[in-house]
Amino acid sequence: MKIKTEPIGSIPRPLELIEGMQAHALGRLDDNGLNKLIDAALADTIKRFEATGSPVITDGEQSKPSFATYPIRGSKQLDPHGVIIPFADGHTRQLPSITGGPFQYQVYANTYLEKAKRLTALPVKQAVIAASALSLLYPQTGIINYSRQQFIQDLLNEAEADIRKSLDSGAYNVQIDFTEARLALKLDPSGGLLQAFIDLNNKVLGRFTEEERKRIGVHSCPGGDHDSTHSADVSYADLLPFLFQLQAGNFYLEYAGEKDKHSVLASIKENMGASQTVFLGVTNVLDPGVETPEEIRDMILEATEIIPVNQFGTTDDCGFSPFADDTSTGRDIAFEKIKARIDGTLLAEKLLNKTTVNLTT
């Protein structure tokens, strides 16, 4: 039996690309110059992904400004002073807010996918941002002649199109980044905000067939930016009863960074559905230390004592650099961790298959 293994998405950008993005934003580098840097980073990312032996790859999100804001890049209807997200180490990230409607994506994720697919024969996975995250773009003060209800309807249509375009463009699967799930419980422990997010995302997922939803997954983590988190103190026992309500086939969960792994596994077993597959993070993206394949093997063997192997897979805890300017994790370290995940998964797979053979002979 094969154990599925997939990356989450982002890979740290080369320093020359980060500097190029900053220069471009200041008007010191033209579009052509930036595109050359992006093309070089993308080609190198795919080459290095292939060298890890990964059966599925991503484009490393080399040209995304961030995992959350790519759809609104270049929009003329933005106020930079939107929702502020605080992290445990004291730094913050701030979303913009929209200033008018109708709300439309400026960029769809399939544009990244199609570019990557031209450079590799391997299956390419595509990450998209959740509708719930983009719902935070609507200002609390409202917008004249553009109600929140109108905005939500436009958002649902655009979020559906973002997923569907990637599926139609040949994505191996599509992963919805839902990192605000845990944060929602921290902000509102009653669960009201998280349930509203779940309901909104299910309105998008409900537009897809059961077969299509087998190729759609959801990623949840406590945030990972500059080696810090925004909601690691929220328990999986509180999160998962909500999360598994989502009408998706695959769930990509931060796990390696969890202190009480036994309780996490118990909560997964209690809440996951029979048709859902859980990919556990087996590399801690906030820790610069590279896991050994043997450590990952042992983590997998422990997990598969609780989670059925046919509903189990491995991944990384989070993207390695969800925001383009994050240099806290080295590019080399990221690929070393991915290689360790691939090798550790294979070690566990061999042992599990050997045990299965022994039990049946």
What are these regions (language model features)?
Residues 1-361:
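Domain-level signal for soluble alpha/beta catalytic cores
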